[in-house]
A protein has these predicted regions:
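N-terminal Sec-pathway targeting helices
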Residues: 1-17
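Membrane-anchoring alpha-helices and their flanking helix-loop junctions
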Residues: 2-5, 25-26, 30, 206
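Membrane-interface motif at the C-terminal end of an N-terminal transmembrane signal
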Residues: 14-33
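Short, conserved active-site entrance elements at the starts or edges of catalytic domains
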Residues: 27-90
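Short, structured beta-strand-loop surface elements
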Residues: 38-50, 54-57, 111-205
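Extracellular/periplasmic catalytic domains that process cell-envelope and extracellular macromolecules
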Residues: 73, 89-91, 98-99, 130, ...
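Short beta-strand segments
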Residues: 76-118, 146
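Short, solvent-exposed mixed-charge patches
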Residues: 208-211
Length: 211
């Protein structure tokens, strides 16, 4: 019994030391090309990362168009997003980002087996953001502390997508229309910068019509 307790204590100590180390060094999510066979075979998902590290930006950004030109040699035009979990260890992923002048957006889509679950439970980071919208983004090697607000008005999402409906439907073998993909957009607000405060006030005006 004593040996078991000792083994458990050693295991706990190793886990704690590992987490403390990763808290300092960070652990980024791996990048897999969405167009690759590897991504398709993995169920269109990859292993998440943990903490993101880098210089934190405290200055307000008034024009986000530059994010559309991000072209990382590995991650291409994607960025990393760190979300808060209920158990305290971050969950970070690779996502798409869109800048439209002074407005910033992130987007994500669900298809195949993910459509079997109600939003936001088909993706872990969606669930995390729904519970706590405070996130950290790594763009160009720097950390931006943000607040995400889901755009619930599908007409507004269609406008952001240049007129494309966020709900994609196709006719199946049974001759009936079936939903094959649903795309969601979030408005992104900076927080923890002197001009904007913590970002909570900026999130208030967003529309709340049904998704």
């Amino acid at each position: 019994m004593k040996a078991v307790k000792t083994g458990v204590l050693v295991l706990v100590a190793v886990v704690v030391v590992t987490l403390l180390t990763l808290r300092v060094t960070g652990l980024e999510p791996p990048y897999v090309d969405p167009a690759s066979q590897e991504f398709a075979k993995s169920g269109r998902t990859t292993r998440p990362g943990l903490w993101l590290t880098g210089e934190v930006v405290h200055e307000p950004v008034t024009n986000w168009d530059w994010v559309n030109k991000v072209n990382d040699p590995i991650r291409k035009n994607t960025i990393m997003l760190e979300t808060r979990t209920w158990y305290g260890i971050p969950h970070s992923v690779t996502i798409n980002i869109v800048g439209r002048g002074d407005k910033l957006y992130v987007q994500g889509s669900e298809r195949d087996f993910r459509l079997q679950k109600p939003f936001p439970y088909s993706k872990a980071w969606w669930t995390n953001v729904e519970r706590d919208p405070r996130v950290r983004m790594k763009i160009g090697g720097k950390i931006y502390e943000m607040t995400l607000v889901l755009i619930r008005d599908r007409a507004e999402v269609a406008q952001l997508q240049r007129g494309r409906d966020p709900v994609t439907k196709e006719v199946g073998p049974d001759g009936q229309e079936h939903i094959t993909q649903v795309t969601h957009w979030w408005r992104v607000y900076q927080r923890n910068v002197p001009e904007y405060g913590n970002g909570s006030a900026a999130a208030a005006p967003e529309k709340t019509t049904s998704q």
